C-alpha cells in the first residue's frame, strides 16, 4: 500500500487503517521476498492483489469511523442525565422530558453490528484465499501440513465453520431499531430497543471472536508452511545441483560434457515450481518437478545439434543417469529437511521473527502452546482454536497485539 493513495481519498478511517498496515508491513521479510519473486518471475503471481487484500483499508475505513462514532455516542449517553422527572432546584421545577428514550444506544449498536459483520466478511474473504491453492501462491490446499496431503483435510472443516460464522454474522447485521412496536396502550408508541440491539451486538462480537480465532490459527499455519517450504526448496536446489554436477559434468572418458550447462536451467525450474505441488512424492513422473527437469534436459539435447549423434557427447544419453541418481537421493534429503524443521533445527530460520507481527505469532505458538497442524498428529484443529478463543475472551491477546504497534508513532509512513 502507498500512503498517497489514501491521502487523496481524505477519509480518516481509511488513512488510519492503511497507516497501521504500512507500519506492520514495513521491513517485512515476506514483502521483500515477494518483490524478489516478482523480479524473477513477474507472471508467478498477479500484478494486483484481489480486493480482499488490495482494498482492505478502503473497506475497513468507514467501519472504523462508524465504531468510533458509536463509541462516542454511547459514552455521551451513559455520562448524561436521564429524567422523568428531572428536578431543577434553581427554578423549583420538575421536568418530564424524554431523555429516557435510549435511541442513541439502539442506533449505535445497530451501526456497530453492521460494522462487525463487514469486518467478518473481509476476514472470511481473506481466509478463503489463504486456504485455496489457486490463490495462496504455492501453499498446499486447505493448508494441509502432512507428508501425504491426501490423508489430511487440513483447514477444510475450519473453512466450512467460517462460512457458517459469516452467514450468522450477516444475519445479525440486520437492524433491530426498525422493529419497534407500540406498547402501553400507545403511550410508548416508539421505543429504542437498545437492550435488544445490544444483546445482538454481543452475540455478533462472540462470532467475530470465533472467526478471528480461526483466521489467526490459519495464519500461523501458513507462516509455518512457508518456513517449511523455504527449507524444502533449499534442499531440493542443493540436491539437484549436486546430482547435476555428479552426473552431467564429466563424460565417459573423463572429458567435460556438454550437459554440464544444464545445471543453471535445472535450478530455475526448482525456483519457479511451487514446492507443495510435488514434495509429497518429489520423484514421481506424474508430478511437475520431474516433468520439467526432464524437459530442460531434452531441450538442451535438441539444441546440442550434431553432437547428439556421438554417444560420448549426447545429452540424451545422460538423462537416465541423472534421473536415477536424483530418485535415489532426493526423497531422503527431503525427509531429512522436514525432520529438521519439525525438531526445531531448520537450516533456514523462520522469517516471521524479522516481522513486526511476530509478537502475535509468538503468543499463539509459544504462550498458548499451539503448533503446525498435520493429519499425522492426534491433536485436532479444534483444540488449538479453543486455546486461542479462550485467550481472546480473557483479553490476553491485547498485549501482544499492542506489542506489534509498539514502535508506531501514530502517523502514516512518509510519501517518498
Swiss-Prot record:
Swiss-Prot/TrEMBL keywords: Cytoplasm, Lyase, Phenylalanine catabolism, Phenylpropanoid metabolism
EC number: 4.3.1.24
PTM description: Contains an active site 4-methylidene-imidazol-5-one (MIO), which is formed autocatalytically by cyclization and dehydration of residues Ala-Ser-Gly.
GO biological process, any: L-phenylalanine catabolic process
Molecular function terms from GO: phenylalanine ammonia-lyase activity
Assembly and binders: Homotetramer.
Protein name per its UniProtKB record: Phenylalanine ammonia-lyase
Organism: Vitis vinifera
Gene that this sequence comes from: PAL
